[in-house]
């Protein structure tokens, strides 16, 4: 029976070959090879592929044949012909030479030997001809001509492969602030489509996706988490990759169709989401006889494919419609039409056609793969992976399908699976630059930075003009805070193509992160001259806002709000633009007022601030909060005086000293860019705090010598007089609000009693205000000024792990945090659920299992649900009392692989009260330590108790986390300011890899924190009294406008 079936199939094969119906012949060969692997049938299938000009399929079948029989001369001949057709002449010569040697070493068919010899001569002649023609061209023209022509020819002949083919086309799709991409993964890079406009794509935390519609592509920006910026350390806008808007060519071969992006030397490539090879291992030889109907069908299929390659999708669909009218279940035509639909973004129709093709021929690997790609473009990643996995059943270890599935796994944030798929793909296709790029992105997300860099560099090594790889590598370096390398990569992109707007956007981001906002504005303006994108508009608006050019800032914010979005994830930028426009108008109205009156916490409505912090839709804010007056009124109200903007010699001296001190705040850790604007802000704030505290201590000391210490201490506790803001009824203002408590310098000594009334909040408020004005788009606000949300525990959130992704800035603290969480669980024998219920862990040896857990995943599996544990801080002011520190949380988000492991610090009224009392006690202890016999001392040894008191106060501040954002930098700024007030200057840098705020958070005892920090801090202190010679900051930079000018003016 089996023999009869085989004979029947052989007869059918001969019939299809005679009628030139190569597609059906391939299907018969697939069937035969599924039953028995035959070298002859494999070569026959390669021959059929050759007739359809599916050269990459020819090569793969020949490679299979040569694995089974290293002396299969026919395989060498077919492979050599395929390589020649692809323009890979040097490879062809190597293959043919190897075949010729093999033929000579055995008793070979003389006809085949002569055919090999002739092919080899022809190939060598072609190479010689190319070299001669190149020698006659000018040095400048030769490289360009060779690059473009050879690539174009190669891709045209190579049009049947998927984007995952060995030429490594990139497949994009857009992702940014949300987790899901909203694009079509099908891209077109055929030479005739070169007239279409370039598309764009974005990349965040390393990921890249792309959206294409009617020749237009849109990029998105990534969202960022509260304390932690998207991994690149700069908050948002993390996706950069310029890609060509062209699509690859399409071909059909038996059960498959392929589309492949061509290599573009001037544009970043867009990986065509469709590709294929559906072979199950089968083939046979072919004769040639005519069969008019079959020839007609194949001819129309070829025409349809050609139309797809030309970008004429409507015509292609019309041709396929005619074929399907005659044969409604013809799988090749269904795949072709589905592909055309996919390019038109009619993804549902495309999926329907691919589904019908699968129903008609369940072994049609190409249909499974293309449907997977279409589903991935819709964000249906689970279903997409299922389809691609099914395709691998019919094409085991197919590099094309593995490449495709690796990309989908990457987009679905299954980075581990992505690495596995792409690594296997690259073992077979070592020249797949797209696979290397995505492998680099996946490794970066997993925190394997060395491997990520190597993968990106390998992609560039394969094609030095591959813009996508350069952009991803630039983004990678930016995330690690290696700005020099990032800028070098961007320069490489612009040398290849200076019209890539994403390169200017990324360079703008780097300059923004470095605090060079005016340079960022220049780059973003160039980017906007190329393409009007929401990313560039928003970022340029925020830069204008920071440097005090409020008219331009408002214009860009308005333009951001008016942009027609091509992806829902970008809506968050429009929300932020709304809030920041209001804040720009508020700041504009304050430019001529004293900087003390710049009071976001007191002037801005609590609801406005909450919605801004959470990036919520501003609808409720518009309805319930009084809006800022128009810009004309704000600017009229706050007209700047020229002397405010002038940098006098006196101001220049202060700025030099401020820059020197400010650099000391820099963390030497991955992800933290050296921001010169933030350094200057910190330096000026340090000096102001030192001046303010020094004056208060002098009064305290004078009073203590008069025997009035008791009254002074009492005064620090008493309720303070608030200075009313000058902006009642302004932007998002609450008419009944009051300013954050602040005390002017002059008022310190003007009190009737002559006693100091500085509180701990008076000490920290200047640092908070400077942080707010230095980067006005960061929501730095006091948490207790956030109305009802404060009661439900609004606070900061700092993730170390997000699913499988490791957050570059904070993951270094993961091991210590996990160890601390386990020790707390062992101590308490329980954890808390998301609903704040106690989860008992004292039974079933759970504690023992928890102590053996090495990852947060294992910890979550043992507990069995989302949970949190709270750290604590031993009180210094009230012996035996414990304050609630931060909450170490481990949760699993719906649809996300892995677990989110982070610290969250809620600030409820009860907790605020506890820390307020502790901070008051710590501040009083510091004042007592300095204002007694140590007052004015210039001996470091005599000031040790003062230093310890400063560190204890800093410890409680970090654990308190009273700000929605910015607690870390303001804490260290105040520490430096207090040391300077006591004549001690920190002259070194924070040790490499150390984040001082985490040192406080992960130590439950203040003494442990003090001992840890003093080991490197104290040896770096020197006595400095010359700082007192500088003019008071409140006098030199008295107005808000003068402060903004000081932060925005640099000699370079």
Curated annotation (Swiss-Prot):
UniProt GO molecular function: molecular adaptor activity
TPR repeat feature ranges: 39-72, 74-106, 297-330, 331-364, 365-398, 400-432, 433-466, 468-500, 502-534, 535-567, 569-591
Record InterPro entries: SRFR1-like, TPR-like_helical_dom_sf, TPR_rpt
Job of this protein: Negative regulator of effector-triggered immunity associated with the EDS1 resistance pathway. May localize its interactors to a microsomal membrane. May therefore negatively regulate RPS4 and SNC1 translocation to the nucleus. Contributes to the regulation of RPS2 and RPS4 protein levels and negatively regulates SNC1 stability.
Keyword tRNA processing: no
Assembly and binders: Multimer. Interacts with EDS1. Interacts with SNC1 and RPS4. Interacts (via TPR domain) with SGT1 (via TPR domain). Interacts with the TCP transcription factors TCP8, TCP14, TCP15, TCP20, TCP22 and TCP23.
GO BP terms: defense response to bacterium; negative regulation of defense response; negative regulation of DNA-templated transcription
List of residues that carry N-acetylalanine: 2
Organism of provenance: Arabidopsis thaliana (Mouse-ear cress)
Protein name per its UniProtKB record: Suppressor of RPS4-RLD 1
Coiled-coil parts of chain: 107-136
Region (Disordered): 131-181, 704-739
Gene symbol of the encoding locus: SRFR1
